């Protein structure tokens, strides 16, 4: 595999700490993964984030397949080189008009890695817009230290324990 990002995209990532939009997996494949997630939810009987917030790829092998998708791995390789490890995978099932949310956080605070050379790839399996709760970022926040994260215990917060 070779990195697929342009020099300009890599520079943007290094400066701002995020990169979007990025052509990810084709819509038909996203639909297949969304169907696998729905099947997984049905078999579990609960939403997967209840049990699999960080290591979902261990219980759901199709998550490993998704994590190895060449479109994603090629982009990551452009940012950190070819030595890539899938360290964690999270599943958040949030339907349209769902009042729940994911609170502001830094992914790096959950992994305890030092130095911070990890990359998070956020993959939406369905359409994601501001109106239905898309990912939001604070540009440049990757340059500072991990901030203190307060547990809210809010039942509407998908990150709550």
Segments predicted by a language model, with ranges:
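Short loop segments at secondary-structure junctions
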Residues: 23-25, 125-129, 140-142
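Non-heme Fe(II)-dependent double-stranded beta-helix
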Residues: 1-113, 150
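Conserved beta-strand segments that form the floor/walls of ligand-binding pockets within enzyme
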Residues: 86, 103, 120, 124, ...
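Double-stranded beta-helix
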Residues: 130-161
């Amino acid at each position: 595999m070779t990195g697929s990002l342009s020099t300009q995209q890599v520079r943007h990532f290094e400066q701002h700490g995020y990169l979007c939009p990025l052509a990810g997996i084709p819509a038909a494949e996203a639909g297949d993964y969304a169907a696998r997630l729905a099947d997984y939810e049905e078999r579990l009987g609960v939403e997967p984030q209840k049990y699999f917030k960080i290591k979902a790829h261990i219980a759901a092998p199709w998550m490993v397949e998704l994590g190895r998708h060449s479109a994603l791995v090629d982009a990551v390789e452009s940012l950190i080189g070819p030595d890539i490890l899938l360290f964690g995978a999270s599943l958040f099932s949030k339907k349209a008009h769902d009042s729940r949310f994911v609170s502001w956080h830094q992914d790096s605070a959950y992994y305890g890695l030092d130095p911070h050379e990890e990359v998070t790839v956020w993959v939406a399996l369905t359409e994601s817009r501001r109106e239905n709760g898309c990912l939001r970022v604070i540009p440049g926040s990757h340059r500072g230290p991990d901030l203190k994260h307060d547990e809210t215990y809010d039942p509407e917060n998908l990150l709550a324990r």
